[in-house]
Amino acid sequence: MLLEAVLLQLLVLATRASPVIFEDCGSAYDLFIVNIAGCGAAVPCYVTLGEQIPVNVMFYADFVSRQLDQDVTININYIHARTPVTPEPCETVMCPVQSDAITSFTSVMSVPTDMALNQRGYLQWRVYNEAGRQVLCYSVLVQTQNYLQKMMRQYVSEAHRKQLHRLGFYGL
């Protein structure tokens, strides 16, 4: 039952999100794809204060890890805000992580509400194994927004898409 729910969540995430531009910051595993719900290849990735945002990663593991722990921060104006994420990877992925296999997992990030608004910074996501080895590390350029700004961006984006469609630019 849990596996079916996770697979359904992955399917929804895969159809609604496109990979974001990320910088690998020292992953031991080969990180292929980072999907953040609501973000695509456009920079920055807008994150809404107080929202729960699904984040999916896909990577190739060339060695076994029995346990994975996440350390996630949003760094804005030299302030490093710890960002709660759930669940831990081994709650959704069969651990140990298999060697010579492509693995994917989804966690949900809670964006803190006490951060500066309309500021750019970096989301940094680190994953450590049971030996304390950093197996995944990436950072993504983000900009904070509130719910009203999110709704306005969606409205403008949809209006722009409709205008392009009327002009004969389909599929944009």
PLM segments and residue spans:
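Cleavable N-terminal signal peptides of Sec/SRP-targeted secreted and luminal proteins
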Residues: L2-A17
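N-terminal edge beta-strand
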Residues: S18-P54
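Short edge beta-strand/loop segments characteristic of extracellular beta-sandwich folds
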Residues: P54-Y60
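Short, surface-exposed loop/turn segments at beta-strand-coil junctions that are enriched for proline
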Residues: D62-V64, V108-L117
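Beta-strand acidic-aromatic groove motif in beta-rich domains, primarily in extracellular
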Residues: R66-I74, Q119-G121
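Short aromatic-acidic-glycine turn motif
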Residues: N75-V85, A131-Q134
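A beta-strand/beta-hairpin structural motif
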Residues: P84-T113
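Short beta-strand elements
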Residues: G132-H165
